[in-house]
């Protein structure tokens, strides 16, 4: 997604060595990974459907496990090249009725953004399903949630400016159509049957498969919104430290940003229903990945994990082929029943990695995936929180030391209980709020040492932790008092 929108990277050997020479000896062409940044823009033009899933250069030999590892290793970059990629989703709704917007309305918004603000359209089977502009993209989630995948940026000031620019554009086009956008983690008012379905091939496959593997997968697809940050690593060891820190602290971020307390017009019993939903979506591809904390963990272990996550699809001839439940290992040797003789390309691997949904996800960067969607200030605060912790060596070491003796059972307990009790969740001799205070200070210190005057972006986090009141609890209090037990005012309260 966001940080992936970098220049295409040819395969890199796991040891950083002479991959090109070895590849030529094995009789293969050098194949770059095609990404958004590698394509030119034509003013007001259209580009192929996202993701770009078919390679122009045909493989002469099957991919090996080494190649799959090398794809991940190619994300390693020196600290001076680390960037911040922020993604967020939001619900579009009709201002007059509060109903979710349909695809026709979304198409009109996309066309309006393309015409007024010079975005290129992404088209699938004659339907506009997204937009691109430089290294930014706008895409549609299954229920029409609008997602901005931001460009890889150097500072949080740039990140927040990007978010503000996007929200200005969306508001300018949407207001003329009587459409608003809501920053919350779960659809507060409407039932699953009220949510429109987007015309994207991969989502049809997922929609049919989800009920077979969990009870809440369709809710995840159609009624949730998140904000996440994508961050870089310099080496395998740096990736491991950040992955472990991110997983251990993900429930703390879930508590701080908890913002999904309503469902179908009433409180739902959770502070972050969105987070809870992931616990019964598809446990083959989600969760806290305890193996990341094993001494043997590294790129190879993640590849082994990903190879065993059941597939969703293969994309060939501009069509999605349903491969749900099939093995990428079988695909590697040309034995997919739905695509006999077909062998995977690096793009197939790239696509497969996007169908894995743990609390922290590894691609050629790490994605922090634990936070609910929220209003614009929190869209700036979430990346600030993680940048201060993971991009500063001293703070990262402090987090590693703090969490090194946490057990798998403790991490799972936090994952399970935080969506219900948030900052009030007991942990050891205190509460998650106590942990959050300590972690916030480490994040502030990390941002101070970066030297870009970015600490102010943590004000929202500071306010939540110092008060002990999560965003969800604040909404619940409004619901019981000022809103007189109606969720309708939340559409104005959290309007972008």
UniProtKB/Swiss-Prot annotation:
Which organism's genome codes for this protein? Answer: Oryza sativa subsp. indica
UniProt keyword Isomerase, yes or no? no
Q: Which GO terms describe its cellular component?
A: chloroplast
**Family according to the record:** Belongs to the carboxylate-amine ligase family. Glutamate--cysteine ligase type 2 subfamily.
Q: Transit peptide from where to where?
A: 1-34
Q: Which UniProt keywords apply?
A: ATP-binding, Chloroplast, Disulfide bond, Glutathione biosynthesis, Ligase, Nucleotide-binding, Plastid, Transit peptide
The record, for PANTHER family, names: GLUTAMATE--CYSTEINE LIGASE, CHLOROPLASTIC
Q: Which Gene3D superfamilies match?
A: 3.30.590.20
From the UniProt record, list the reaction(s) this protein catalyses.
L-cysteine + L-glutamate + ATP = gamma-L-glutamyl-L-cysteine + ADP + phosphate + H(+)
Write out the PTM section of this UniProt entry: The Cys-160-Cys-380 disulfide bridge is known to modulate the enzyme activity according to the redox status. The oxidized form constitutes the active enzyme.
User: Which GO biological process annotations does it have?
Assistant: glutathione biosynthetic process
Which NCBIfam families does its entry note?
glu_cys_lig_pln
Which residues lie in Low complexity bias regions? Answer: 29-38
Q: Where is this region: Disordered?
A: 14-53
> What name does this protein carry?
Glutamate--cysteine ligase B, chloroplastic
The gene is GSH1-2
């Amino acid at each position: 997604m966001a940080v992936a929108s970098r220049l295409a990277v040819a395969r890199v050997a796991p040891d950083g060595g002479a991959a090109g020479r070895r590849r030529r000896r094995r009789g293969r062409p050098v194949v770059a990974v095609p990404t958004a940044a590698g394509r030119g823009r034509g003013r007001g033009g259209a580009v192929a459907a996202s993701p770009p899933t078919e390679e122009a250069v045909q493989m002469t030999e099957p991919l090996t496990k080494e190649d799959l590892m090398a794809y991940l290793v190619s994300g390693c970059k020196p600290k001076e090249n680390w960037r911040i990629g922020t993604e967020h989703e939001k619900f579009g709704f009709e201002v007059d009725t509060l109903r979710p917007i349909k695809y026709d309305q979304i198409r009109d918004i996309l066309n309006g953004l393309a015409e007024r603000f010079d975005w290129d359209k992404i088209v699938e089977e004659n339907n506009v399903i997204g937009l691109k502009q430089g290294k930014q993209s706008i895409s549609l989630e299954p229920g029409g949630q609008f997602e901005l995948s931001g460009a890889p940026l150097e500072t949080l000031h740039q990140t927040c400016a990007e978010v503000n620019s996007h929200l200005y554009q969306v508001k300018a086009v949407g207001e003329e159509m009587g459409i608003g956008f809501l920053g919350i983690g779960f659809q507060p008012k409407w039932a699953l049957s009220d949510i429109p379905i987007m015309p994207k091939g991969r989502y049809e496959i997922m929609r049919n498969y989800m009920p077979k593997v969990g009870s809440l997968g369709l809710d995840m697809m159609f009624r949730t919104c998140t904000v996440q940050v994508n961050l870089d690593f310099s080496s395998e060891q740096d990736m491991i430290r950040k992955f472990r820190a991110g997983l251990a602290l993900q429930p703390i971020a879930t508590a701080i940003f908890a913002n999904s307390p309503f469902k179908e017009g009433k409180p739902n019993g959770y502070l972050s229903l969105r987070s809870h939903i992931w616990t019964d979506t598809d446990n083959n591809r989600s969760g806290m990945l305890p193996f990341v904390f094993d001494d043997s963990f590294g790129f190879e272990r993640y590849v082994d994990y990903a190879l065993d996550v059941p597939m969703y699809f293969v994309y060939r001839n501009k069509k999605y082929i349903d491969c749900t439940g099939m093995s990428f290992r079988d695909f590697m040797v040309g034995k997919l029943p739905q695509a006999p003789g077909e062998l995977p390309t690096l793009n197939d691997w790239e696509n497969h990695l996007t169908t894995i949904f743990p609390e922290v996800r590894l691609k050629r960067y790490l994605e922090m995936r634990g936070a609910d969607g929220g209003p614009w200030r929190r869209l700036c605060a979430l990346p600030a929180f993680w940048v201060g912790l993971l991009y500063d060596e001293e703070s990262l070491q402090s987090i590693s030391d703090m969490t090194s003796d946490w057990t798998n059972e403790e991490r799972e307990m936090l994952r399970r209980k935080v969506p219900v009790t948030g900052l009030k969740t007991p942990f050891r001799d205190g509460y998650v709020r106590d942990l959050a205070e300590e972690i916030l200070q480490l994040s502030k210190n990390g941002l101070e040492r970066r030297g870009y005057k970015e600490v102010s972006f943590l004000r929202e986090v500071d306010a939540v932790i110092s008060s002990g009141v999560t965003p969800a609890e604040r909404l619940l209090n409004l619901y019981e008092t000022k809103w007189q037990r109606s969720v309708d005012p939340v559409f104005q309260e959290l309007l972008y």
